[in-house]
């Protein structure tokens, strides 16, 4: 093996010397590298591999402002003072990649080294994990180390498995087959055996120098050395590849290194020669096999770690489980992911470890909090929070010797590095805030482990460095997007130029020029500059400059990649490095106080980027989010800086929780600084250079502090965080307050004085208002001072009684100054509510309202005057209620304010005022929820008021009328309607009530009315009798709030349910001699007390009248008696009927002319004789005086019968038959003749209406009882519809017979009506109006086939003579019984005739007794008997027909 000068090449092809590279795991310095390396960890490689992830950001069109210093008279650097951070790259700047080891015993590495960068980084590497997920890396830089490099070890365990090379290359060059056979093959075999034992992926690379030999080109039988190698070592997989150099026929070695190829992608175009294509194929084969080996090793390493993690995780609940050991193994998996550029997977491992760290059992495994008591000048406070190179953290974790503080710092640094690599500065800033918060809690929890001022200096330095890192990362993302867009535009231009050149030049020439043009493009990474989380520019990577520095051992100062660049002495800007989302050096800001007093903040656009109008929405949102987080970090830094100033003595102590501020404020401002000031050498007390400079004097601190607050303000304004601006305003105002700049402090405090009161943050509100009040008192702003004192006396703000008394006495003293006129809102000291019962008052009437005042003070206070104003709708007059000289006690106070209504109008609540000397407390009542009462109604007009209104009236009547009744009322009985008269706020000097019924109800006249009079206020009741004059009720001398109640008797005699109207009219005169008239129309429902449903049931020519009676009365009634009129109580002969009719006529003549109309109607209806007589009353079981309640039913059943002579006359007389027919024909109509039909009956019921007992006990009811008729009568008409018989069928049969013998069955059919009338009433010929002289009829014998056999016709057609009434036709047939016993005779019907129109008189024999045969006959004898019977029947039938 030849000694080759160690070189290191980045992926862009630049060659440089090696540089010191630290362990990516944070271990101690890795030392100088003496072996040749091919480093892929430069900033350019990172940017090339990650630039695609920043495409979502819109590039800026303006360059970034990168000035790091200010042009000020006094200027000093805020870089790190630590030499380690100045000489070495921080661990976050160094990115480890996958390594490949090679062994070169033929001294051919120099050829590969020159060409290999043109084919890197590797692209599109993917593999599948055991979970089935596919890991894909688009671009993977690699680092190639020589086999004897100190970083390449012989054996690797779980501690450093992630450092193990992923592929071992064996480079061989041999042209002589014998030499290969005798020497080289054995060496290769030994090397392969060694790799196999280590389970390591390996690859043999055969390098050919010079062009192909003539034998290789002409003979295919000759085996080359490469063919022998493949034959010897390609056993299971092709692990051999070939490269060729120094081929004069191949020009790709010189030009192809500028080619932008894709690994394994084939040739680059059609313009290349055949030898060039073959050379590209060799390189593609080499790269493909290299990627296969890397993938295989990565899967092997991942499997090893995952299996180990799975085993340890399963034992997590067992005693003795070590969290640090588990962390060490799991971090190894994360480091593998990181080297493979799978940053999200690596970050997930750390997040899971952080979650496990939250378990108290795991956290308790850390034996010590810190290695030693940490001082503010220690290395931890010099701003190197992201640098893990100065301490071997992994070794400490492996040995379980790491402290809790170091572990938290290391875990955060690793997470931050991955977040920056993922280009997530916003998430990194969020993580930074939570990390600083948790670390401050640890420092506070273990104060013995940390020296004074360590917490403040550590938080300040850490926050400042994290701010710079986050903003640099964001700037790099934005610039990367901008550079990528520019590069795309350049490529587009080159393509256009190529098309133009192809038209003028040859294909080969044009292709070669295109390659040269592309290769001359500046890499994107070189445009980024120095970035902390991504590494720096080429000077910070393993480049020639850094390598020379490391080789010579000289500590040459280098620009820090993080930290604050400079501090301005002039006060314009403090942090030149805060340029992530805005260029703080170039911002043009107004004065601080003026900006903070502006209510509507205007976001300042970033001058270092394009205008916000041209930025995409996503970038603007990310920019605002980062500005807000950076602002919070910077504000935290400013607070820690202030705490350091307080400790040193530059500022007084800020105790927000101290009570009695008005007593302690003098001591805080004027005495605390002189008493507590200590001598501190900031250069030795702190290791962070900004703190060393800024804390040298009070002036430098003030300058730094105000500039920090100015930058915070701009960040908050640009991120639109108004609440944070308010918090910042308080910090600035408080600092001016301590510096006795009361005018500035007042303006700032006043701008946020009401913000925290609305959100009930009493802690902050107390601090704001106490300081504001002191400033106002010192400046002599007494009116504003009273306002602030009122705010301090709000409930829940002051807890000390002495403070409350102090500020209250201040208010009272200032109110006595005659030159002042102070107006304050009533809330929060007082709450008022105005109520009043009445809303309508008379002209010049005294009006009283109730005012409830709730005082939130702890002491009583006396007011000179109180006023409640009501204003007229629109504008003009006022109604003012007043109360003078009253004392308001703490809590609820009730007062009564009075006023006189001197203006007739409607007044609305306006305001309430409470006055102490020259101080007035006011409150608007326009939208207050005021309870009101009262209200009323007039006689002619209706007075309505809205809530909070008072109406003063003069000429409107408030009297109202009201009627009531136990609706519904009943017909045919005296009923009573109650009437109420309410005077309300009105009076009646004289008046009269008149009663009428527009609908015809009878108002029963009476001589006097009993009136019950009651007072609505005193509830006193009295009764008196008032005599009616001409049916009118006079009224006189009725005062305010009186109610008159009386009952009006009336009766209605309608037959159906109806509504009657009662009109009550009042005419009255007031004391003012004004006359008014009002009326009330009341609608009252009248119903029948009973509802009767009747039905006539015909059972075997017997008529039963069934009535169902239902009680409709709202009250219980007593069923006394009943009678059935229009029906004789018993059968009467015609002579008796004629005699009774004569007696009735004589009685009618003897009646006087003054008889009631009801008796006349009943007399007229009784002149005609009754058609029916009562056979039997089946209701004897009904109890006397039966009580019926509403809804109850009772049933009455009567058996009646119609006189035969009437039936006969109706059937024989043509006129009566026609009337009966018309009555039957209009069966479905109720509009019969006006005269009562002879078929009508009337059910008369006597009942007693019972009122409820509670009504009977009332005095007014008892007085009216004399007019009440106890027993009432109720009549209900009943119409009996009897069927009209058209035909009569008589059946005749002998009473007994024997089974099997023929029985003579005779049928006689009688015509009862004329044939023309039959056609109108029968259902057989509806609608046939044609006159016919004969009607064809057909009878049908319906016999049970199980009992009878019919001998003859079961159906027969016949006809009657049309002019004959009472005509009879006889028919007969033979019936043969086939069953013995009492058998029913068959039924005979007429086809087409309704059975209800056929009369079946009661036959003599409805049944026939059939006996078994008494003799036993032979067949011949039985046949002879049947023939004889048939002959006799036939002869009888022929006789009937004749």
UniProtKB/Swiss-Prot annotation:
* Subcellular localization(s) per the UniProt record: Golgi apparatus, cis-Golgi network
Q: Where is the composition biased (Polar residues)?
A: 1-23, 554-564
> Which positions carry the signal peptide feature in this UniProt record?
none
Which keywords describe this protein according to UniProt? ER-Golgi transport, Golgi apparatus, Transport
Q: Which GO terms describe its biological process?
A: early endosome to Golgi transport; intra-Golgi vesicle-mediated transport
The record's listing under Pfam families reads:
TRAPPC10, TRAPPC10_1st
Q: Which domain of life is it from?
A: Eukaryota
Query: Its quaternary structure?
Result: Part of the multisubunit TRAPP (transport protein particle) complex.
The family classification in the record reads:
Belongs to the TMEM1 family.
Record's protein name = Trafficking protein particle complex subunit 10
User: Which organism's genome codes for this protein?
Assistant: Dictyostelium discoideum (Social amoeba)
């Amino acid at each position: 093996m030849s000694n080759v000068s160690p070189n290191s090449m980045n992926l862009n092809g630049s060659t440089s010397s090696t540089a010191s590279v630290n362990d990516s795991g944070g271990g101690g310095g890795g030392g100088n590298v003496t072996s040749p390396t091919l480093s892929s960890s430069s900033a350019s490689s990172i940017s090339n591999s990650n630039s695609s992830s920043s495409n979502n950001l819109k590039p800026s069109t303006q360059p970034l402002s990168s000035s790091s210093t200010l042009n000020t008279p006094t200027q000093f650097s805020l870089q790190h003072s630590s030499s380690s951070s100045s000489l070495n790259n921080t661990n976050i700047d160094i990115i480890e990649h996958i390594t490949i080891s090679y062994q070169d015993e033929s001294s051919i590495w120099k050829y590969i080294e020159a060409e290999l960068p043109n084919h890197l980084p590797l692209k599109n590497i993917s593999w599948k994990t055991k979970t089935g997920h596919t890991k894909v890396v688009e671009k993977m830089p690699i680092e190639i180390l020589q086999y004897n490099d100190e970083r390449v070890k012989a054996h690797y365990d779980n501690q450093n498995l992630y450092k193990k090379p992923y592929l071992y290359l064996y480079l061989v060059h041999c042209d002589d087959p014998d030499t290969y056979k005798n020497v080289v093959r054995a060496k290769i075999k030994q090397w392969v055996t060694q790799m196999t034992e280590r389970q390591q992926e390996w690859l043999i690379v055969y390098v050919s120098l010079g062009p192909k030999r003539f034998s290789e080109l002409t003979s295919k039988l000759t085996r080359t050395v490469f063919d022998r190698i493949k034959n010897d070592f390609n056993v299971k997989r092709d692990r051999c590849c070939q490269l060729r150099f120094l081929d004069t026929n191949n020009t790709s070695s010189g030009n192809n290194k500028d080619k932008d190829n894709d690994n394994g992608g084939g040739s680059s175009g059609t313009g290349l020669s055949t030898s060039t294509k073959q050379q590209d194929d060799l390189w593609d084969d080499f790269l493909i096999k290299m990627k296969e080996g890397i993938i295989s090793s990565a899967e092997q390493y991942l499997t090893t770690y995952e299996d180990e993690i799975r085993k340890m995780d399963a034992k997590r609940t067992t005693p003795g489980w070590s969290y640090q050991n588990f962390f060490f193994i799991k971090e190894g998996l994360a480091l593998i992911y990181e080297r493979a550029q799978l940053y999200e997977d690596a970050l997930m491992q750390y997040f899971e470890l952080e979650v496990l760290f939250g378990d108290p059992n795991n956290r308790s495994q850390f034996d010590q909090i810190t290695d030693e008591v940490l001082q503010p000048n220690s290395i931890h406070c010099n701003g190197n929070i992201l640098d893990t190179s100065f301490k071997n953290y992994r070794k400490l974790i492996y040995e379980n010797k790491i402290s809790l503080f170091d572990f938290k710092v290391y875990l955060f640094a690793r997470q931050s590095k991955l977040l920056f690599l993922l280009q997530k500065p916003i998430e990194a800033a969020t993580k930074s805030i939570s990390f600083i918060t948790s670390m401050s809690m640890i420092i506070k929890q273990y104060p013995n482990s940390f020296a004074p001022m360590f917490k403040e200096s550590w938080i300040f330095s850490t926050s400042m460095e994290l701010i710079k890192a986050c903003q640099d990362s964001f700037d790099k993302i934005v610039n990367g997007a901008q550079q990528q867009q520019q590069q795309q535009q350049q490529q587009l231009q080159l393509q256009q130029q190529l098309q133009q050149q192809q038209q003028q030049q040859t294909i080969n020439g044009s292709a070669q020029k295109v390659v040269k043009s592309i290769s001359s493009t500046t890499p994107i990474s070189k445009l980024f500059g120095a970035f902390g989380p991504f590494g720096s520019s080429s000077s910070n990577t393993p480049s020639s400059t850094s390598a020379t520095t490391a080789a010579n051992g000289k500590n040459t100062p280098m620009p820090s990649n993080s930290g604050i660049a400079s501090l301005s002495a002039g006060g314009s800007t403090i942090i030149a490095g805060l340029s992530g989302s805005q260029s703080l050096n170039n911002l043009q800001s107004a004065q601080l106080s003026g900006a903070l007093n502006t209510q509507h903040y205007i976001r300042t656009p970033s001058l270092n980027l394009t205008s916000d109008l041209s930025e995409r929405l996503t970038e603007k949102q990310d920019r605002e989010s980062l500005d807000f987080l950076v602002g919070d970090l910077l504000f935290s830094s400013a607070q820690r800086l202030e705490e350091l100033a307080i400790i040193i003595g530059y500022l007084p102590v800020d105790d927000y929780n101290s009570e009695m501020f008005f007593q302690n404020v003098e001591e805080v401002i004027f005495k605390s600084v002189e008493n507590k000031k200590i001598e501190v050498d900031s250069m030795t007390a702190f290791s962070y250079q900004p703190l060393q400079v800024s804390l040298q004097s009070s002036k430098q601190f003030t300058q730094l502090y105000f500039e920090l607050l100015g930058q915070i303000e701009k960040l908050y304004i640009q991120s639109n965080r108004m609440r944070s601006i308010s918090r910042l305003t308080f910090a600035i105002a408080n600092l001016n307050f301590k510096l006795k700049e009361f005018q500035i402090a007042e303006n700032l405090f006043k701008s946020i004085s009401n913000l925290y009161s609305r959100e009930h943050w009493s802690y902050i509100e107390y601090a704001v208002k106490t300081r504001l009040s002191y400033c106002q008192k010192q400046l002599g702003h007494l009116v504003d001072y009273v306002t602030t004192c009122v705010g301090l006396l709000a409930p829940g703000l002051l807890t000390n009684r002495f403070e409350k008394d102090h500020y209250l006495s201040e208010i009272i003293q200032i109110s006595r100054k005659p030159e002042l006129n102070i107006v304050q809102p009533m809330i929060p000291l007082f709450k008022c509510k105005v109520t009043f019962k009445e809303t309508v008052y008379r002209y010049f009437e005294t009006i009283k309202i109730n005012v409830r005042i709730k005082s939130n003070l702890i002491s009583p206070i006396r007011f000179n005057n109180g006023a409640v104003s009501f204003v007229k709708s629109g504008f003009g007059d006022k109604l003012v209620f007043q109360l003078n000289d009253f004392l308001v006690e703490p809590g609820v106070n009730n007062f009564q304010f009075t006023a006189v209504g001197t203006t007739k109008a409607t007044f609305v609540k306006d305001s309430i005022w409470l006055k102490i000397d020259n101080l007035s407390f006011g409150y608007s009542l326009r939208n207050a929820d005021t309870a009101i009462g009262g209200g009323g109604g007039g006689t002619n007009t209706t007075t309505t008021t809205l809530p909070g209104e008072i109406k003063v009236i003069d000429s409107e009547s408030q009297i109202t009328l009201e009627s009531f009744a136990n609706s519904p009322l009943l017909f045919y009985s005296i009923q009573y309607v109650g009437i109420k008269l309410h005077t309300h706020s009105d009076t009646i000097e004289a008046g009269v009530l008149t009663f009428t019924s527009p609908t015809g109800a009878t108002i029963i006249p009476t001589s006097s009315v009993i009136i019950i009079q009651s007072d609505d206020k005193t509830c006193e009741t009295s009764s008196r009798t008032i005599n009616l004059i001409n049916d009118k009720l006079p009224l006189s001398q009725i005062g305010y709030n009186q109610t008159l109640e009386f009952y009006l008797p009336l009766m209605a005699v309608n037959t159906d349910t109806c509504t009657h109207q009662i009109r009550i009219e009042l005419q009255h005169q007031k004391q003012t001699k004004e006359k008014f008239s009002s009326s009330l129309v009341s609608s009252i429902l009248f119903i029948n007390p009973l509802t009767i449903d009747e039905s006539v049931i015909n059972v075997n020519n017997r008529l039963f009248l069934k009535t169902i009676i239902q009680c409709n009365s709202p009250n219980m009634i007593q069923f006394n008696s009943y009678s059935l009129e229009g029906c004789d109580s018993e059968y009467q002969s015609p002579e008796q009927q004629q005699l009774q009719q004569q007696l009735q006529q004589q009685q009618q003549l003897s009646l006087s002319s003054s008889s009631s109309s009801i008796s006349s109607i009943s007399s007229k209806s009784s002149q005609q004789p009754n058609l029916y007589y009562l056979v039997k009353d089946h209701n004897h079981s009904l109890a006397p005086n039966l009580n019926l309640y509403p809804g109850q039913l009772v049933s009455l059943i009567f058996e009646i019968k119609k006189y035969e002579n009437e039936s006969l006359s109706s059937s024989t007389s043509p006129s009566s038959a026609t009337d009966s027919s018309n009555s039957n024909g209009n069966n479905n109509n109720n509009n019969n003749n006006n005269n009562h039909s002879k078929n009508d009956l009337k059910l008369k019921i006597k009942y007693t209406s019972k009122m409820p007992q509670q009504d009977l006990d009332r005095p007014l009811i008892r007085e009216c009882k004399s007019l009440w008729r106890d027993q009432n009568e109720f009549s209900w008409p009943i119409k009996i519809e009897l069927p009209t018989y058209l035909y009569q069928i008589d059946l005749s049969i002998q009473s007994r017979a024997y089974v099997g013998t023929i029985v003579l069955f005779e049928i006689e059919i009688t015509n009862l009506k004329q044939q023309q009338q039959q056609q109108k009433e029968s259902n057989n010929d509806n609608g046939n109006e044609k006159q016919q002289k004969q009607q064809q009829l057909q009878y049908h014998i319906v016999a049970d086939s199980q009992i009878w056999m019919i001998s003859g016709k079961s159906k027969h057609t016949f006809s009657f003579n049309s002019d004959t009434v009472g005509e009879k036709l006889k028919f007969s047939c033979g019936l043969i019984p086939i069953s013995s016993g009492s058998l029913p005779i068959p039924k005979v019907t007429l086809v087409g005739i309704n059975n209800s129109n056929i009369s079946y008189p009661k036959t003599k024999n409805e049944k026939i007794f059939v006996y078994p045969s008494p003799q036993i006959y032979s067949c011949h004898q039985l046949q002879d008997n049947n023939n004889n019977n048939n002959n006799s029947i036939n002869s009888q039938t022929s006789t009937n027909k004749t």
